[in-house]
Structures are given as structure tokens and as C-alpha cells.
Amino acid sequence: MWRSIISFLFFSVALCQPFLFQKRSSNISDFISFNASLPNVTIFAMGGTIAGYASSSTETVDYAAGSVGIATLVDAVPAIKNFSNIRGVQVTNVGSEELTPANVLNLTQLILAEVAKPDVHGIVVTHGTDSLEETAMFLDMTVNTTKPIVVVGAMRPSTAISADGPMNLLNAVVVAASNRSIGRGTMILLNDRIGSAFYTTKTNGNMLDTFKSYEAGFLGMILDQRPHFFYSPATPTGKVHFDVSNTTELPAVEILYGYQGLNPNLAKAAVDLGAKGLVLAGMGAASWTDPGNEVIDGLISNQSIPVVYSHRTMDGFSDYYYNGIPSYFQNPQKARYMLMLSINAGYSIQNITDIFSLEY
Ligand code: GLU
């Protein structure tokens, strides 16, 4: 009762000020529909194919990602208004390959402020799929909340026949607005499936069913705008939290790829170029070559550079490797953000090893 009254007053005031919000920033639109009985969901829009535009409805490859604004995306799915009140915030509008750690840090700080508002039930982030899992993992490690955070994308541009974005967006809002979604960390939603940000990865560059979590499985699915979760809320083993509320810049961490005859000195070059840590996308479970390991050992012992051994295979478990830090289940792109956050927190190589090994 009191919650409804307070939320009515709050959002009525907000609704009376659309012009004010527009004047303050053309990127921000306030709750565009309001019904006191519905939960409030904030959508942060980053761009990607879900906001992609092509001049032909049959074009699904050659299109401009990050072209359509959040208000247009929401307008295209009127059913959203049956599930929640929406506030849309356009943070960036680019292909996700253009996003930087600074963009992701900025998004995180916006979300931290948003989830602190008592009347916000959940968060949706619209995002390009190419680096979606990186942002989702970062949010999972930095936004310490039981409120649902759902990162959503699309594989077909908004102008395509059978565009998947509108249904994905509707489903993401449904999940963010549902009480069943509380306490499940950051989730990734595409193609009617709900995955944990900790485990889900993009597995195919073109197909609609690209996001998978083969080993850990999905958290749930959506049918007729009803989220069905397979298990009660749980936290992934080894999930850590990092406080970035006062962080202004993240340390540089580079990823090196493993292959037959790899150049051992690329690791040194990366450090000379400013890397404060390295992640290796090793062969198999994390193999690096003998000459490569020699260089890595030197960087660890002489320059105290933390080096995480991960795997170029999609799944697998990287155990102890030489003097490096095993990534355990984390793929290189997720391990990179974990290492950046660990270095940012001032942790020693031993501390970082302990953090990664929490997964095991
Ligand atoms: N490369 C673009 C991006 O990641 C388009 C891919 C997509 O969103 O599916 O934003």
C-alpha cells in the first residue's frame, strides 16, 4: 500500500517533468508510461544490433549497429507497458566492439545509482552481442544487488523481417520486472533463454541461438512472457564482488592468444606498451609453449606482472600453470575483467590467485 502511494507520488512528479528531463539531457527519457500497480524497470541502452538499422528488411549482415534510439525500441514493443513502467537511458549507441572499459565503468556507476533507488525493481541493458558477455560479467562482479539485471541483445537488426530484438527486449523487461528473478545476479537473455552472466558466452557469430552455457546450463527460459527458472536463486561458485563506486580508470590488461609457434616476446611487448596484467588464451586447458612460459615467468618474477592462464577452447578448466594464475572456468575475455578489477583493488599476485581459485 505505502509502496504504491510513494511510487505513485514519485513517478507522477517525474511524469510531470518530461520537458525538464529533455532539456537537461537529450539522452534521458523518463518513465514513458506509468501504472502504479506495475514495477519500475530502467533500461540502459548501449547500442548493438538490437538498435541496428538497414535500408532493406532482408538485410541481416550489412547494417549499421547502434543506430536506433531507446525510445524507438520501446515504442516498437507496446506490450512492455503491460509489465512495467519504463525509464530509458541512452548511454552509448555503438557496436559493442567499440565499447571500452571506461564505457562499462560508467554504465556500472549509473546502475549502482539506479539500484539504490527503492522504487526501481530491475535493470535492463540493451547491448551489442559481440562483447555483451564482457559487460554482463563486469556488472555481475561490481553491482552487489539482489535486484535483477538483465543484459539483452539481438542477432538481427531492428529493421529486419523476424527481427529478434523486440521479443528479446520484451522478455528482458519481463524478467527484470519479475519477483522470480530476484537474487540471481546479472543475467543474459536472448532467444527465450535466461543465462547467468558468469557462465554464458557467445558461441556463434551469426545464428540466433548463439548464447550458450554448455557446462553450467541455463538458469531458465521464457514462455508466453512468464519466466520459468529451473532452480531457486543461487550464486555461482567463486563469484566475487569488487567495489568500483570510486574508480575512475581501470588498469590495462591484455589478452594473448596461444597457437603453434607463438612469439614468446609478444608478452614482453604488451607489458612494455603498458599492460599491468596479462591473460593467456592458452591451447587446450591453458597450454603455453616452453619458450613462452620462460618469458612469462620473467615478467612475473622480475616485474610482478600477474598473468592469468585461461583457455582458447570455449569450455574447460585451467588448473595450475607454472607461476601463473589459473583462470579455472573463466574464458579469457571474462578473466580479463576479473584481473583488471583485482589489480584495481590493489591485490597481490597471491591474493589474485586466491580469488580465481574460489571457483574450484
Ligand atoms: N558488432 C555489433 C555489436 O556487437 C553487432 C553485433 C550484435 O549486436 O549482434 O554491437
Swiss-Prot record:
It is an enzyme of class 3 (hydrolase). PROSITE patterns: ASN_GLN_ASE_3 (PS51732). It comes from the Eukaryota. One of its GO terms (cellular component) is extracellular region. The active site is at residue 49. Residues 39-359 form the Asparaginase/glutaminase domain. Its EC number is 3.5.1.1. This is Probable L-asparaginase 1.
